[in-house]
Regions:
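Gly/Pro/Ser/Thr-rich low-complexity, intrinsically disordered segments predominantly at protein N-termini
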Residues: 1-140
Length: 140
């Protein structure tokens, strides 16, 4: 991954961590596995999990927020396969794709009618009671 990719992921994780600690939530970066039933394992760029501790020392299963920072090599996977798998999780409230080249967010946000796709410069992360902005993500 590029330096920009890493910086953006770290900025988002740091912003999430500020909000997560007082809520007893956990924030992970790309070295923690997300296991989706017995079907797949992914390593999201950033993941937030609230509630009880991990089901296993090496993976989580119930994130409320997942972030992928797009890169040319992974964009198709992030937008298709991973999106379908992540949105199948009962715990998920928001799946955020960050495009570092275009500097924009695409969020899949859970509503009573199901997931809604939104593009913009900010996204609400309900489990952290946080609004993440492009400025947060791209701070140098």
């Amino acid at each position: 991954a590029s330096a920009l990719h890493n910086r953006v992921a770290l900025n988002i994780a740091a912003r999430f961590l500020e909000a997560a600690r007082p809520r007893g939530c956990r924030v992970y970066m790309s070295d923690m596995k997300l296991r989706i039933r017995d079907e797949a394992v992914y390593y999201p760029d950033v993941m937030v999990v609230c509630g009880e501790g991990p089901p296993h020392p090496y993976y989580e299963e119930a994130p409320c927020a997942v972030v992928e920072v797009l890169s040319p090599a992974t964009e198709a996977l992030d937008r298709r396969e991973k999106r379908a798998m992540y949105l199948s999780l009962d715990s998920l409230q928001v799946y955020l794709l960050v495009d570092p080249e275009r500097r924009r967010f695409t969020a899949y946000r859970l509503t009573p009618e199901g997931f809604v796709e939104e593009e913009g410069e900010e996204v609400d992360v309900p489990c952290l009671d946080l609004r993440l902005t492009l400025e947060d993500a791209f701070r140098l």
